[in-house]
């Protein structure tokens, strides 16, 4: 195969050898291969023809630069690269005499030659000029049409000069172009863009306008790739194509040394360094480096989605998105990792995956020095620092800092779940969730922790787990300074300060801070309890709730406190317990300033100020502030006391009451005051005791504004205002405000 990368190869196409003539001896310049238009001529071209002119002109210039025949960049190239239209003033050089052809620019084609004016030159002058100027005359064609052996072609190559001169006279007519359709367009004016007016000795007049001359000519694809068999009309296109096989990238960026196989890709890349974005959107003013990027962006405003999937009818604004989408139906995964063999349907996902093996994170945040594998991830991360949320939901007005987050949120309103599991039929709104779910069927856990050997189904789970070993907490709350290991934890924590509850139940309107809480709540409407305990038959909505419940029967307490060694059945109980040692109370009451270590305790405490008692007994109508208090009260109607003490056989309605009672027998007092070392059997007793040291009286009477250090004192005091006497004597019916008063009274009756 001949060397198509050599500059001289452009002169040996399809077996035709282009021999130099006397007029070829000067060096080629860009003026020799550019077609000039007047303003009037340019206006007559439609957008397709102008685009064709732009593409061919830039390609011709690129090839001149690649073989070292052009140094300075002409203004017209700069204009075309910037997307502006070149308005070339019509030359004022007279046309008509042979001497005029010497002084007139050789590449300029005027209105008279293109018949734009509608005037016809004399037939004799046309025939004579055609014969004199035609480079494809009989003698010349005889030379070019000699097929020639490889030895003959090699001899011709050796005799060819390095620099050649191509003038307007070397441009073939359309008729001749069909005969010699392999003449290299990379060093001549494109045969498809603009050709000489076709005039033969038999033809006396021809009226051809610019638009007709610029119509693309369907030509034979005679340049064929030996590697894959793909054919091209021009061998310059074949040369570019062959670089995909050879990996050749001759165009190198001086700034970052990145190389490209095509010059236009280098030009577009250099705009990253210069910041040049010549393509502006008329709607929003956003700038783009490339014209196609602008076209794709404008579809956001127009809503145009011209690419439609034949399988499901889904439409896309970009063809690449359609191609990627179709792989969902075909299951095609053409990108395979050489390290672990994992396959991907999208090249971007494949490139991201490879960075897991290399550890490469080239994109760094200037604010916090955090690094990322993708520039888009860095851009989204930076919005955490700026607070920018550019994507707004039209349904609820909520704003998001990333498009993917916005799209996921929008599916909450539409209920769309396009990704379905083939195993169990469960549907998901995100493809990543489907991928994660499928691992529950396969049991696959490909991500191993190097520290402890624990395996995970997801890379994100491994990344979160690693923070346990490193203790890293990069996400900090601006309000209270608390730090978190995960961004999601910080987002959830912020809702404590903002009181935001974005997740609302469509059935009853109740709102929740977390989506998981909403999902749990919604099951109360459906009453779906699919998980049943084999020991006692109790059913639960979630499998995790069943697992926790089963610990009652097994006595398992897998969560241990490192400070005091106490064990717990639930992780949440351990977290709450640890706050006793740390003294942490992040939940503060705005009314009285009292702080709590749990949010639920703050919620319950606020009812003291508001007087709210949302839990009402269906039997007697009595209302309570806490759900647990209602549950305790209801057992007075049923007399149910399932928890028995092994020491004294006393029965209790709650297991917590039994645990507290058993401390009487054991003498255990696990709650110690840091001020005076006094110990208590209950944490509530310790809390109330600590108020004696601080002088704090957080419980206020709404009637007289009197304050108390303990809630029980406030409850007893409020009976003065309400005249409530809940403790009645069974013998005489007399009622008392306090239990102690009832006990004293009962001693007056005989037999007590």
From Swiss-Prot:
Residues 28-99 form the KRAB domain. One of its GO terms (cellular component) is nucleus. InterPro entries: KRAB (IPR001909), KRAB_dom_sf (IPR036051), Krueppel_C2H2_ZnFinger (IPR050826), Znf_C2H2_sf (IPR036236), Znf_C2H2_type (IPR013087). GO terms for molecular function: DNA-binding transcription factor activity; RNA polymerase II cis-regulatory region sequence-specific DNA binding; zinc ion binding. One of its GO terms (biological process) is regulation of transcription by RNA polymerase II. This is Zinc finger protein 184. SUPFAM superfamilies: beta-beta-alpha zinc fingers, KRAB domain (Kruppel-associated box). The modification Phosphoserine is found at residues 117, 122, 200. It is found in: Nucleus. Gene3D superfamilies: 6.10.140.140, Classic Zinc Finger. It holds the Pfam family zf-C2H2. May be involved in transcriptional regulation. Belongs to the krueppel C2H2-type zinc-finger protein family. A zinc finger (C2H2-type) spans 223-245, 251-273, 279-301, 307-329, 335-357, 363-385, 391-413, 419-441, 447-469, 475-497, 503-525, 531-553, 559-581, 587-609, 615-637, 643-665, 671-693, 699-721, 727-749. Keywords: DNA-binding, Isopeptide bond, Metal-binding, Nucleus, Phosphoprotein, Repeat, Transcription, Transcription regulation, Ubl conjugation, Zinc, Zinc-finger. Coiled coil: none annotated. There is a cross-link at residue 207 (Glycyl lysine isopeptide (Lys-Gly) (interchain with G-Cter in SUMO2)).
């Amino acid at each position: 195969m001949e060397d198509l990368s050599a500059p001289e190869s452009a002169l040996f196409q399809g077996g035709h050898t282009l021999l130099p003539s006397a007029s070829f001896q000067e060096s080629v310049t860009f003026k020799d291969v550019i077609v000039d238009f007047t303003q009037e001529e340019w206006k007559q071209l439609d957008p397709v023809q102008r685009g064709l002119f732009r593409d061919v002109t830039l390609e011709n210039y690129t090839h001149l630069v690649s073989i070292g025949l052009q140094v300075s960049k002409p203004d017209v190239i700069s204009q075309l690269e910037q997307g502006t239209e070149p308005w070339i003033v019509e030359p004022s050089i007279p046309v008509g005499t042979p001497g005029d052809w010497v002084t007139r620019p050789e590449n300029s084609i005027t209105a008279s030659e293109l018949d734009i004016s509608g005037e016809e030159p004399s037939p004799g002058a046309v025939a004579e000029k055609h014969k004199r100027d035609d480079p494809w005359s009989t003698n010349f064609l005889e030379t070019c049409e000699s097929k020639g052996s490889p030895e003959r072609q090699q001899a011709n190559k050796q005799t060819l000069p390095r620099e050649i001169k191509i003038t307007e006279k070397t441009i073939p007519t359309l008729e001749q172009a069909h005969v010699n359709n392999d003449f290299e367009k990379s060093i001549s004016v494109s045969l498809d863009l603009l050709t000489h007016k076709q005039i033969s000795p038999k033809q006396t007049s021809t009226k051809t306008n610019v638009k007709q001359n610029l119509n693309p000519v369907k030509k034979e694809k005679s340049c064929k790739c030996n590697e894959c068999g793909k054919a091209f009309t021009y061998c310059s296109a074949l040369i570019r194509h062959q670089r995909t096989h050879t990996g050749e990238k001759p165009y190198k960026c001086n700034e970052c040394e990145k190389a490209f196989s095509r010059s236009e890709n280098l030009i577009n890349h250099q705009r990253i360094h210069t910041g040049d974005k010549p393509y502006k959107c008329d709607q929003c003013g956003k700038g783009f480096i490339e014209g196609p990027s602008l076209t794709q962006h404008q579809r956001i405003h127009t809503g145009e989605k011209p690419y439609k999937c034949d399988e499901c009818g889904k439409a896309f604004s970009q063809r690449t998105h359609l191609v990627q989408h179709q792989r969902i139906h075909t299951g095609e995964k053409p990108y395979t990792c050489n390290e672990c063999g994992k396959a991907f349907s999208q090249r971007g996902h494949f490139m991201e995956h490879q960075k897991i093996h290399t550890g490469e994170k080239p994109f760094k945040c200037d604010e916090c020095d955090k690094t990322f594998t993708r520039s888009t991830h860095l851009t989204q991360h930076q919005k955490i620092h700026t607070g920018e949320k550019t994507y707004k939901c039209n349904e609820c007005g909520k704003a998001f800092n990333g498009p993917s987050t916005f799209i996921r949120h929008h599916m909450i309103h539409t209920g769309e779940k396009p990704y379905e599991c083939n195993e169990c039929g469960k549907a998901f709104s995100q493809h990543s969730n489907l991928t994660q779910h499928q691992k529950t069927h396969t049991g696959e856990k490909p991500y191993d922790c190097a520290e402890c050997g624990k395996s995970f189904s997801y890379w994100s789970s491994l990344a979160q787990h690693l923070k346990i070993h490193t203790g890293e907490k990069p996400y900090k709350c601006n309000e209270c300074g608390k730090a978190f290991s995960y961004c999601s934890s910080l987002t959830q924590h912020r809702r404590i300060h903002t009181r935001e509850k974005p997740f609302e139940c469509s059935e009853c309107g109740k709102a929740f801070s977390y989506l998981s809480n909403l999902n749990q709540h919604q099951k109360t409407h459906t009453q779906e309890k699919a998980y049943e305990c084999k020991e006692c038959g109790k059913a639960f909505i979630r499998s995790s709730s069943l697992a926790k419940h089963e610990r009652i029967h097994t006595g398992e307490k897998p969560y241990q406190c490192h400070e005091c060694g106490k064990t717990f059945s639930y992780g949440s109980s351990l977290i709450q317990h640890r706050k006793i040692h740390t003294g942490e109370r992040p939940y503060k009451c705005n009314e009285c300033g009292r702080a709590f270590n749990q949010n639920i305790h703050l919620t319950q405490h606020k009812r003291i100020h508001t007087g709210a008692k949302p839990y009402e007994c269906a039997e007697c109508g009595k209302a309570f502030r806490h759900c647990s208090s209602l549950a305790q009260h209801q057992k007075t109607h049923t007399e149910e006391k399932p928890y028995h003490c092994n020491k004294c056989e006393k029965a209790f309605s709650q297991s917590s009451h039994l645990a507290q009672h058993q401390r009487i027998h054991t003498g255990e007092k696990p709650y110690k005051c840091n001020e005076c070392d006094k110990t208590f059997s209950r944490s509530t007793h310790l809390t109330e005791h600590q108020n004696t040291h601080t002088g704090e009286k957080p419980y206020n009477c709404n009637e007289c504004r009197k304050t108390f250090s303990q809630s029980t004192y406030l409850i007893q005091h409020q009976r003065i205002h309400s005249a409530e006497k809940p403790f009645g004597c069974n013998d005489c019916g007399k009622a008392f405000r306090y239990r102690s008063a009832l006990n004293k009274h009962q001693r007056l009756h005989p037999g007590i």
